Amino acid sequence: MDNQGTLALESDQVADFFELGFLVLPGFLPAELVGRLEPEVDRWVDSGLRDRSIAACLDPEPSGTPGLLEIELTAHGELAGYPPLLSIISRLVGPEFVFHHMHSNRQAPGAAGKEWHHDYEQGPLADRSKIMIHALHYLGGLDRTVGALAVLPGSHREVAGKRARAHLGTVELPGEVVIEELPAGSTVLLHSALFHARRPSPAGQRRERYMVDSSYCQCGVSWPPVKPYWRHLLARGRELGLDGGRWPELFAERHFTEYVRPS
């Protein structure tokens, strides 16, 4: 950490991110923040707020908005604009980047895995000129009781659709790296074009998996939003001051195209 409490990246960590497409930050989030995030995740899931948020994305009217956003939960809002995280992102993509979206979930013990995919939103397909980053925050860490994250180093340099490897399920692939042991509060930063998969936990002892992911896009191109209520999301980020007065582009609308409903 530097004298402002920000994790200072070494040059080789920056180089590894660009070469491999991911960066592992064990125990990155302080226990105090994790302790406030977990009950907010419980509320988000148990009250039906998560389901209503998903339903709002399926609303035929782009103006439809959910009653509450993840970033309106106090600790989630802090996480979206968490200064040490944004400082690291600025080291990777430069000083101007914009918040894209946040997802929060508590997965049941023994939940199924998720097939190989990537989450890069830029189009057309051949455009990889700017970087999108997904920050995967594992509140309870990772171990065999919650499954593992498998990543395919270097695959972020491919020009491929999100589901180009989905037919493979979660099978082991040559060259993959499996991240399966991380302490509570750990974060994995992914170049969003990196192929990755969620491996289910093996049979036996299992526990719930708490994860919040937030994504950020390098400025310089127009990014497609994934939520029809994206303007409302950005406006709330500005109103709540989640940029901390330091990142003026973090919730700026001008970096997005219009929302297009998936076909």
What are these regions (language model features)?
Residues 126-144, 181, 215-219:
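Short, conserved beta-strand element in jelly-roll/cupin
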Residues 2, 194-195, 199-263:
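Non-heme Fe(II)/2-oxoglutarate
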Residues 103, 118-120, 137-141, 151-153, ...:
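Short, structured patches in soluble enzyme cores that scaffold and shape functional sites
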Residues 1-19, 26-125:
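Non-heme Fe(II)-dependent double-stranded beta-helix
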Residues 121-132, 175-176, 182, 207-208:
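A short beta-loop-beta micro-motif enriched in histidine and acidic residues
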Residues 142-199, 221:
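Double-stranded beta-helix
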Residues 116-119, 164-173, 203-206, 227-232:
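Short, surface-exposed loop/helix-turn segments at secondary-structure junctions
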